[in-house]
Regions:
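C-terminal regulatory/interaction module of P-loop NTP-utilizing enzymes
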Residues: 1-185
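Short, surface-exposed loop and linker segments with low hydrophobicity and enrichment for Pro/Ser/Thr
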Residues: 186-191, 215-218
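Basic/aromatic-rich interaction segments and small domains that mediate binding to polyanionic partners
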Residues: 197-225
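Short coil-to-beta transition motif at edge beta-strands of beta-rich domains
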Residues: 189-199
Length: 225
């Protein structure tokens, strides 16, 4: 059965996010029939963290001209028949951790974001905006995958989502902010040029843990020897 529409679930998260991550998963507030159904979750393309969305305040409203809501709604309806997935071809390559449903969900999220930023079908999409949309789409889809992993389904254990910009680009990994800890070392692969290392210490020094980062920058001049 093919569906021509989609659904959006909106609700309040009444518990602390960090606590919920320790004792359960982020789909816990859903009704019992849904909260542990990984097959249902696998069809959710995006989990948007409402706790990161700022509340409305006067600074978010404009005094300039705007579009009437019914006209704007019609514009969005017309955009539904279009796709921006072609903007990804030859420019973005997904990592091996993404399944077929992961790729489908991420592609649709990227397409939707690009349609909001570039309503014109022929408008060229900049590399910066494309990478922003790719990273956001991977994050919101991975948030779904992480909850499936917490429920205990072995098929969802690989959540290391990554992408590469261009055929010669460097593979970059995308994580979800709520899983990161300031005081610990996560299991995420490090960026290129970074490594963790241990120092055994010495007679007057204690053992230590160090994170080494290699950076590249322009030179400051020429030295003649």
């Amino acid at each position: 059965i093919r569906a021509d529409g989609s659904i959006v679930l909106v609700g309040n998260f009444d518990v602390d996010v960090e606590h919920q991550q320790r004792v359960g998963h982020l789909f816990g507030p859903l009704p019992p029939e849904m909260r542990n159904d990984t097959a249902f979750m696998d069809r959710i393309h995006c989990f948007l963290p409402g706790w990161d969305v700022p509340k409305l305040n006067p600074g978010l409203f404009t005094e300039h001209f705007g579009l009437v809501s019914d006209f704007l709604s019609e514009c969005f309806t017309q955009l539904r028949s279009q796709s921006r997935v072609s903007s990804l071809q030859g420019r973005v390559y997904w990592g091996g951790a993404l399944s077929g449903r992961d790729t489908n969900g991420v592609n649709k999220t990227v397409s939707g974001l690009l349609k909001l930023m570039y309503p014109g079908m022929q408008a060229p999409v900049s590399e910066e905006d494309l990478e922003w949309a790719v990273r956001l789409a991977l994050e919101v889809r991975r948030r779904v995958k992480e909850q499936q992993k917490r429920i205990g389904a072995a098929e969802f254990r690989n959540t290391h989502f990554s992408y590469t910009m261009g055929a010669e680009g460097v593979e970059k990994f995308v994580s979800t902010p709520e899983l990161q800890s300031q005081g610990g070392i996560g299991d995420e692969p490090l960026e290129c040029g970074q490594i963790w290392t241990l120092s055994p210490g010495g007679q007057d020094e204690h053992p230590g843990l160090f994170r080494l980062e290699v950076t590249e920058g322009p030179g400051g001049g020429v030295r003649v020897l």
